[in-house]
Amino acid sequence: RGLGDVYKRQALYWQLNDNWPVASWASIDYFGRWKALHYMAARFFAPKAGYIYTEGTKAVISAANETLENQSLNVTVRIRDVELNVLFEETVETTVKAQSSIHVLERDFADVIGSKKRRVFAEAVYTWQDGTTSTEAESFVPYKHMDLLQPQIETSVTEKDGTIEIQISADCFAPFVWLEIEEDVIFSDNCFDLTSEETKTIYIQKEDVLSGKVLSADNVRKTLKIRSLRDTYEQ
């Protein structure tokens, strides 16, 4: 994913799956269940993807296009505080050539961040020409040093044509949100960041039920557990 010669942009992914039921660094366990790593790998290995790198008060917003065609791209960059207030916003329109990556925006946000480095994060919303969208977020300090708030997460579970839809939203910045239910399933997304008050929709398809009961909205509603990074903090 580097900016250099195309032949130097390979990545080694270790390791995909397990062939015995033990605790390991595989991203898919022995039973076919996706761990947090695999959900994240699905995003960072996407054919069209965005990235944020921060150092000090500086941020570099990048985009990679591994398809065989040039792709036009719209990126909205925001600096938000943990209460989701927008402190800075700028939209950039650009084109990412086939099989290449670019820096969309590089900026020192010291004037925006001030003394709030532990309470702010960078957000980039990517919209590609085919309508594909993704959102990236990155803090300016290690997450363990962030003054995260305890999010109040609201959910709504419905069923349509055999597909379970989970609507989820939070009232503050919620990094690394993790969904879990009683049955073994593969969610359409998991281990994601909630960076705004907009609702995110997660799907469970019939073919993604690995074991357990026949899924229904009622089953999911009763057993759904949601955690975020803040829940790992000592009280």
Where are these regions (language model features)?
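Flexible loop/turn segments at secondary-structure boundaries
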Residues: 18-24, 59, 70, 82-86, ...
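Low-complexity, acidic Ser/Thr/Pro/Gly-rich terminal tails and inter-domain linkers that flank the onset
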Residues: 35-64, 82, 140-161
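Short, hydrophobic/aromatic beta-strand segments
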Residues: 71-76, 174-181
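Intrinsically disordered, low-complexity Pro/Gly/Ser/Thr-rich segments with frequent PxxP/GP/PP motifs
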Residues: 78-116, 184-212
